[in-house]
Amino acid sequence: MRAIIIKKHGGTDELTLADVPKPQISSEEALVKVKACALNRLDIWTRQGMPGIKIPMPHILGCDIAGEVAEIKSSSSKIKEGTKVVVSPGISCGICEFCKIGWDSLCDQYQILGFQLDGGYAEFAKVPVKNLISVSNRYSFEEWAACPLVYVTAWHMLVTRAELKKGET
């Protein structure tokens, strides 16, 4: 597949279009056909490099992903192949005490797509099924890609933390 990668930290001249292996998914993972990936400030920081933080190279940037599920390996997910999704870019273990109370970002194993893990500046992105959020056709992929960080933050607070249920306001 084609992807925009960096081989070292630096300016925009370090962004390179390259052929890279298509990700292979395991149980409870999905392969998302990336339709749009917004530029997030985190992508710039990652490209430029941050003192004390090592990023695996070569690296695919892009944390704000919108796309369509191309392949999914899950027996319990309601999301199926062809579903339009945005991706919650923060990946946690799901089993530690912080994850159990909804504080995923405090997980010792917390990673972000496009930062510690390969992201969405590619034709496909490998994503945990639990990080997929199905979205409507009301907006374009480009519009959805512009809002994962804000959308996911608001969704997390309403659904996970406040436990808002259908019909409640």
Predicted stretch roles:
Residues M1, T83, G167-T169:
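Nucleotide donor/acceptor-binding cores
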Residues P21-A38, M50-K100, S136-Y139:
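Glycine-rich beta-strand-centered segment in the early N-terminal region that forms part
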